[in-house]
From Swiss-Prot:
It is a peripheral membrane protein. Residues 80-82 form a propeptide. Belongs to the G protein gamma family. Residues 61-82 are annotated as: Disordered. It comes from the Eukaryota. PANTHER family: GUANINE NUCLEOTIDE-BINDING PROTEIN SUBUNIT GAMMA. Keywords: Lipoprotein, Membrane, Methylation, Palmitate, Prenylation, Transducer. This is Guanine nucleotide-binding protein subunit gamma. One of its GO terms (biological process) is G protein-coupled receptor signaling pathway. One of its GO terms (molecular function) is G-protein beta-subunit binding. The modification Cysteine methyl ester is found at residue 79. It is found in: Membrane. InterPro entries: G-protein_gamma-like_dom (IPR015898), GGL_sf (IPR036284), Ste18_fungal (IPR041848). It comes from Lentinula edodes (Shiitake mushroom).
Length: 82
């Protein structure tokens, strides 16, 4: 009979520990700083409008060879394996 009681107590302690860990995670989530969706979307739109993307020339216009970070280097001494 005492082994049953010990097993139940161990299960109860395990459940308590899990609940305490879950409670701690929930408290951490609650303490995390939040940003409103409207602020986040406005920030994303502002970033997209001000950051030039060289891979979308239809929006930003053609990119000069000297400005293109994805263009081929003029050194010509390196080989390219594809």
């Amino acid at each position: 009979m005492s082994s049953r009681t010990g097993g139940r107590q161990a299960m109860s302690e395990l459940k308590l520990r899990r609940l305490l860990e879950h409670n701690a995670r929930l408290k951490d989530d609650l303490a995390r700083p939040r940003v409103r969706v409207s602020e986040a979307s406005a920030s994303l739109i502002r970033y997209c409008k001000t950051t030039k993307d060289h891979l979308v020339p239809s929006v930003w216009g053609p990119v000069g060879k000297s400005e293109d970070p994805y263009g081929q280097t003029s050194g010509g001494k390196c080989c390219s394996v594809q």
